[in-house]
Amino acid sequence: MAEHAPHCTDLQKKILHHECPEHGLEYFLYDETVLAVLLRTAYKNNDIKFFTPSTFSQQLGYMNRPTGYDIPPHDHNPVSRNVEWTQETLFIRSGRVRLDLYAPGTRNHLGSCELLPGDVVLLAHGGHGFHMLEPSEMIEVKQGPYAGDMDKTRFVPQDGPLARSNAHE
């Protein structure tokens, strides 16, 4: 297992934090389940690369194309998809944000990671929460339409940073 990035703390032995050979790509796994895929602003590749398996209801990819490269005009065909779990992707536009990850089922705190401007994180499984370390802007993308209270269950963690403070939204 690779060394933890300096801005990922308290990962302990409960979560596998794996940095891929491509600098700037991090996977967070728990019991072989992908909790999150973090694409740091430093990530570079000379082609197109997708980081999520085809079983995910959201796909996270990266494209690096030269000047003059064309992506032919296209539209998308209707395809029936069954979405059981909401997966969301956050783009950090400004500020510093602490991401807290929680185990699927038990909701035990597994670790925290600092997100910086330009970082993109896909949250696939388990619980998560955020704490703004400074004024921050985030852009969120997830499946719609939003199902209101049916879409998420809020919880007060028994351990971790938010167990000792009041959770907001």
Predicted regions and their residues:
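Short acidic-glycine-tyrosine-enriched beta hairpin
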Residues: A103-H125
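Short beta-strand His + acidic residue motifs that chelate non-heme Fe in jelly-roll/DSBH
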Residues: P73, L99-D100, V121-L123, G127-L133, ...
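A short, N-terminal "cap"/entry segment at the start of jelly-roll beta-barrel domains
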Residues: M1-Y62, R164-E169
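Double-stranded beta-helix
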Residues: G129-E169
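Conserved short histidine dyad/triad with adjacent acidic residue
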Residues: Y62-E84
